[in-house]
A protein has these predicted regions:
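N-terminal signal peptide c-region/cleavage motif recognized by signal peptidases
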Residues: 14-17
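Extracytoplasmic copper-binding redox domains, predominantly the cupredoxin/blue-copper superfamily
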Residues: 19-144
Length: 144
């Protein structure tokens, strides 16, 4: 019995060790201009985590589009948060105070099962952008 429990625990540890943590920086200025997440597109495996890192002040990360069955997140202002992504699909997130400046990003987890819906909702979201109107569409174009 003890051998079975130990074997099960080792198996779970090996599975957990396979999950990666990726980082997304919250920036005032980056390679794509003002008020950006870097990278703006990230492809990860199911079970991986994404940590939103505060580099510059006055930013947060809030999921606005998630796959069916997934839980959205909303970080506080200037908060570094780590989000575990267990549901396959496309996630779109924004910085609440800079959403109008198209401070948005996309995470693809495994297969993009909700891509059509994510593109449709993102097109509506982009109507509220006052600058960088194609930034979110460019990030979504990287989903494969």
């Amino acid at each position: 019995m003890k051998k079975t429990v130990v074997a099960a625990m080792l198996g779970m540890a090996a599975f957990a060790a396979g999950a990666a943590e990726h980082q997304v920086k919250m920036l005032n200025t980056g390679k794509d201009g003002a008020m950006v997440f870097e990278p703006s597109f990230l492809k990860v495996a199911k079970g991986d985590s994404v940590k939103f890192v505060k580099v510059d002040p006055s930013h947060n990360s809030a999921a606005v589009i998630v796959p069916s069955g997934a839980t959205a997140w909303k970080g506080k202002m200037d908060e570094e948060i780590s989000v575990k992504l267990d549901q396959e699909g496309v996630y779109v997130y924004v910085c609440d105070p800079h959403k109008v400046m198209a401070m948005a990003g996309v995470i693809q987890v495994g297969k993009p099962v909700n891509l059509a819906d994510a593109k449709k909702q993102s097109a509506e979201l982009a109507k509220g952008f006052v600058m960088n109107k194609d930034r979110l569409a460019k990030a979504l174009d990287q989903v494969k």
